[in-house]
Amino acid sequence: HMPWSIRALEAGKHVLCEKPLAMNAAEVRQGIEVQKQIGKLFMEASWNRWHPRTIRLNEIVKSGAIGEVKKIRTAFTYTDLDPANIRAIYELGGGGLYDLGPYSVAAPLWLMNFAPTSDIKTEVKWHAGGSDETLKVNFKIGGVEAEAITSMATADTLYFEVTGTKGSVAMGGNDAFNSHNKPSTLEIDIEGKKSVENFEACDPYQLMADSFSNKIRGRESWLMPLSESLKFAEFFDEVFKVMGRP
């Protein structure tokens, strides 16, 4: 994605780029330098960050309602991937970490304000195309235990759960990272008092695109900064090292 994004920037275009923004942190740094020189908007399209449910989960955690965060669990898996699909070819950016990691693996990072990470451990099953077919990453972030799962070869499983000293909050249903145009829920448990918050159907892709276009027009709107994309890429580089990939 990055080489074409750079070409578009150099052609004077604002760029909303499909995730992952790049194959590694070095490429992201290159893109950041080009963006600074050109002055056009450049953002990684992590649409789930605009979903009202995601925003609300973040608010609940940051408010301290569930107490001090102790554990974060995420998963984004699906099955029946065609072996010839580009998503399975490592050299072309394939694999669960590249394809699904920007959702499930990145979530603990932004939720914990990119606190220092440590103790990265991985369990991986390799695809015939050379990519990571199924991956579990366990790590600590700011002292919080985190577990993130990605897979292109297991039953559809999507969750985002945060547990604290006073309770927990979790995305209801089986759609934590693929809720498009349908109602969704948050399940909250604070000191034994359980509740459910409901969210109307929405198109988070449109919300993201609207935010990007509003910024182009000079209107106030939130964009995910490239500094966050760089931190994601740096962490993914570390995960790849532990996995045994280049």
Name what the model sees in each region.
Residues W4-S5, L9, D80-L111, T117, ...:
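Structured catalytic cores of enzymes that bind and process phosphorylated ligands/cofactors
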Residues R29, S211-P246:
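C-terminal helix-rich "cap/oligomerization" subdomain common to oxidoreductases
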Residues V105-N178, D210-R219:
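Contiguous beta-strand/loop segments that form the cofactor/metal-binding neighborhood of enzyme cores
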Residues M2-R49:
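Beta-strand-loop-alpha-helix segment that lines the small-molecule cofactor/substrate pocket
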Residues S179, V196-D210, M224:
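Active-site loop of classical SDR/Rossmann-like NAD(P)-dependent oxidoreductases
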Residues L41, N48-K121, W126-H127:
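Predominantly a Rossmann-like dinucleotide-binding segment in NAD(P)-dependent oxidoreductases
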Residues F160, N178-E191:
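Short polybasic amphipathic segments
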